[in-house]
UniProtKB/Swiss-Prot annotation:
It comes from Bacillus subtilis (strain 168). PANTHER family: METHIONINE SYNTHASE. This is Uncharacterized protein YxjG. To B.subtilis YxjH. One of its GO terms (molecular function) is 5-methyltetrahydropteroyltriglutamate-homocysteine S-methyltransferase activity. It comes from the Bacteria. Residues 1-11 have a biased composition (Polar residues). Residues 1-33 are annotated as: Disordered. One of its GO terms (biological process) is methionine biosynthetic process. Disulfide bonds: none annotated.
Length: 378
């Protein structure tokens, strides 16, 4: 790397707490046993208990596979979910699932139809994913288990507001959502969670002309929405325990190796990099759609970790490690190398369909991340 480090600084490059030098976003390709069991459950050929046992067995297997790649962090691959966001959001108080007329439009492909609507007061009383985390925690061993949930902004971005008080008062809606999330974060912490990630595609609306039209349809302005999104997150994570790491993954969409949005971080950079009280940010940087590293100049905090998603999860071909290292060096011109980490740009299966690569290619990608990180931060 271009920056010279002293022995003391070099020692600090070996991070003992998350996010780690080699990290991952979270979702993994659903295995064939899980896919088959889900179909059997839907057809009435399997009980919920039988499905959960198969999920348990497969999660145990993939946790070990993650460890074999050299990662210090493990997830359950989101194996119990169909969607990265809806499964969590529809189990909040005041939220219900529904079937819209069409799915979400991605680049040349559309998801199956699924939506959520806000019909009552938003709150958090309990949630099935608490048990999901407890199982992961029980099998993680020496690795750090990470829980991934959608950002509070996703309820605004993807939720159909049917409660009149919320439709007429976004500030009230934000207040109640953040309050519910604050309870959720504490509930996961009480189950032993010390590494929580918020996944967020809502920030992509600021990054393109298409997104700006969406903001106009919301009846607000970009400045107002940036402030609302930032307050939603900051209020939700305020006063969190000192030993809880909370990061956010900013995504431009990830469905069957396609995307929904493109554009650099410039239009929301000051808010993202200097307005959120998070411990780390997972940033997509796997191709030209994500722009350059110049927006990192807005980073003011020396304790904010930036996890560069320079390895794509959309395709199986491995990146040239020298190219990845060169890009890390480029990023280090704007922030200290000590503040940088490496991961895939997104999960491998944000929905149960998964991206277009094999499971072995997935593990190879994660090994690739670990090997490159070990070379850079050695």
């Amino acid at each position: 790397m271009s920056q010279q480090t002293t022995p003391a600084e070099q020692k600090s490059l070996q991070r003992k707490k998350p996010p780690f030098r080699a990290d991952q976003v979270g979702s993994l390709l659903r295995s064939e046993p899980v896919k088959k069991a889900r179909l059997q459950k839907a057809a009435g050929e399997m009980t919920a208990e039988q499905l959960r046992q198969i999920e348990n067995d497969e999660i145990i297997r993939i946790v070990e596979k993650q460890k074999e790649t050299g990662l210090n962090v493990v997830t359950d691959g989101e194996f119990r979910r169909a969607w990265w966001h809806f499964d969590f959001l529809e189990n909040l108080d005041g939220v219900e699932p529904f079937t819209p007329e069409q799915g979400i439009q991605f680049h040349n492909v559309q998801t199956k139809a699924r939506g959520i609507k806000v019909t009552g007061d938003i709150d958090f009383s309990t949630h099935p994913m608490l048990e999901d985390y407890s199982f992961l925690h029980s099998i993680a061993g020496d690795a750090t288990p990470k829980m991934t949930i959608p950002s509070p902004n996703m309820l605004f971005f993807r939720g159909k507001l049917e409660k009149d008080e919320y439709k007429n008062d976004y500030q009230l809606f934000q207040h109640d959502v953040s309050k519910a999330y604050k309870k959720a974060i504490q509930a996961f912490y009480d189950r032993g969670c010390r590494y929580l990630q918020l996944d967020d595609t809502a920030w992509a609306v600021f990054l393109s002309e298409k997104g700006l039209k969406q903001i106009e349809a919301f009846g607000t302005t970009p400045d107002e929405l940036r402030q609302l999104f930032a307050k939603s997150i900051n209020d939700a994570i305020a006063d969190r325990p000192d030993d809880l790491t909370v990061t956010m993954h900013i995504c431009r969409g990830n469905f069957q190796s396609t995307w929904t949005a493109e554009g650099g971080y410039d239009a929301a950079a000051e808010t993202i990099f200097d307005g959120l009280n998070l411990d780390g940010l997972f940033l997509e940087y796997d191709d030209s759609r994500s722009g350059g590293f110049e927006p990192l100049r807005y980073v003011k905090r020396s304790d904010l970790q930036l996890v560069l998603g320079l390895v794509t999860s959309k395709f199986g071909e491995l990146e040239n490690p020298d190219d990845v290292k060169r890009r890390i060096e480029e990023a280090s011109r704007y922030v200290s190398l000590d503040q940088l980490c490496l991961s895939p740009q997104c999960g491998f299966a944000s929905t149960e369909e998964g991206n277009k690569l094999t499971e072995e290619q997935q593990w190879a990608k994660l090994r690739h991340v670990v090997e490159i990180a070990n070379d850079v931060w050695k």
